Amino acid sequence: MAPQNLGTFCLLLLYLIGTVIAGRDFYKILGVPRSASIKDIKKAYRKLALQLHPDRNPDDPRAQEKFQDLGAAYEVLSDSEKRKQYDTYGEEGLKDGHQSSHGDIFSHFFGDFGFMFGGTPRQQDRNIPRGSDIIVDLEVTLEEVYAGNFVEVVRNKPVARQAPGKRKCNCRQEMRTTQLGPGRFQMTQEVVCDECPNVKLVNEERTLEVEIEPGVRDGMEYPFIGEGEPHVDGEPGDLRFRIKVVKHSIFERRGDDLYTNVTISLVESLVGFDMDITHLDGHKVHISRDKITRPGAKLWKKGEGLPNFDNNNIKGSLIITFDVDFPKEQLSEEAREGIKQLLKQGSVQKVYNGLQGY
């Protein structure tokens, strides 16, 4: 082999060996940069898990492999210690490996049964009994509504497990006919039951990841299928988290708009002012006024409201109402005369029905 070809072969061999040692590129699998936050990683997993789930891709022979790669990537990058080891040494550097069930990871985001991939929750068979649904109010802050977030909820869930012995199940009413004599029959209603393996309810701790989407509205529900009350003869019900947006000390929400009040001094109301308002994510909204600002005056800052739930690229407005803080001390006679001379404004005393707009 020529020296040049030998060198090329050696470089190719070293590259292949390095690739094998490094293992899978978990950042590429999730489609996030190496600087991604834990929220970015969770958001990417949740989106891709729905797209790559094997039940949604029955014609893809690699669907199961892709889904497993996605679960492995999330398991490592969502754990700070595993992520640190992976960033330093690659996949082979992980001490204890990553052997969690990727179905378990999926259920943390969607529940035991996930979604029917036609876009609707699971279809109910009316002949199969199911446990009660559970609705839980989940309080979220206005900051979370603005930027989105993932909330971890730890739930002690009763789960049906097999136990020794047998039990009666699927009990139902049936009509029985008994012949009493020639041409005489008696019909009675009896309870008939099947015999099933015995079960017992065991509490198991589950961690659920609830995604608070930007612009989420008060009262919206996030379902976790199969996470409700169990039924020993059928399916468990669903767990639904109902969003409850808590009141904010500075901003009030009305649709996609935000409202707030700003108090300025009498001097500022007359000569103008500059100030910044700290928004929900920490960025500054600058306000500059070089003209008279009357009490009750409003200022609209377009695009500084909340993101629209259906289209996060659209944002509402921030509406600012100004209050004027008048001096607390009484003015001296000299100060009064000075103000009169400065403003040169005569008496304006008008009585009218302000509520009707006259």
Curated annotation (Swiss-Prot):
InterPro entries: DnaJ-B11-like (IPR051736), DnaJ_C (IPR002939), DnaJ_domain (IPR001623), DnaJ_domain_CS (IPR018253), HSP40/DnaJ_pept-bd (IPR008971), J_dom_sf (IPR036869)
Major subcellular site: endoplasmic reticulum
GO annotation terms (biological process): protein folding; protein maturation
Glycosylation sites: 261
Signal sequence, start to end: 1-22
Compartments, as annotated in UniProt: Endoplasmic reticulum lumen
Modified sites of kind Phosphothreonine: 188
Domain J: 25-90
Keywords (A to Z) from UniProt: Chaperone, Disulfide bond, Endoplasmic reticulum, Glycoprotein, Phosphoprotein, Signal
Post-translational modification note: Contains high-mannose Endo H-sensitive carbohydrates.
GO terms assigned for molecular function: misfolded protein binding; unfolded protein binding
Coiled-coil zones: none
CC per GO annotation: endoplasmic reticulum; endoplasmic reticulum lumen
Record CDD domains: DnaJ (cd06257), DnaJ_C (cd10747)
PANTHER family per UniProt: DNAJ HOMOLOG SUBFAMILY B MEMBER 11
Entry function: As a co-chaperone for HSPA5 it is required for proper folding, trafficking or degradation of proteins. Binds directly to both unfolded proteins that are substrates for ERAD and nascent unfolded peptide chains, but dissociates from the HSPA5-unfolded protein complex before folding is completed. May help recruiting HSPA5 and other chaperones to the substrate. Stimulates HSPA5 ATPase activity. It is necessary for maturation and correct trafficking of PKD1.
Subunit-level organization: Part of a large chaperone multiprotein complex comprising DNAJB11, HSP90B1, HSPA5, HYOU, PDIA2, PDIA4, PDIA6, PPIB, SDF2L1, UGGT1 and very small amounts of ERP29, but not, or at very low levels, CALR nor CANX. Binds to denatured substrates in an ATP-independent manner. Interacts via the J domain with HSPA5 in an ATP-dependent manner.
Protein name: DnaJ homolog subfamily B member 11
UniProt gene name: DNAJB11
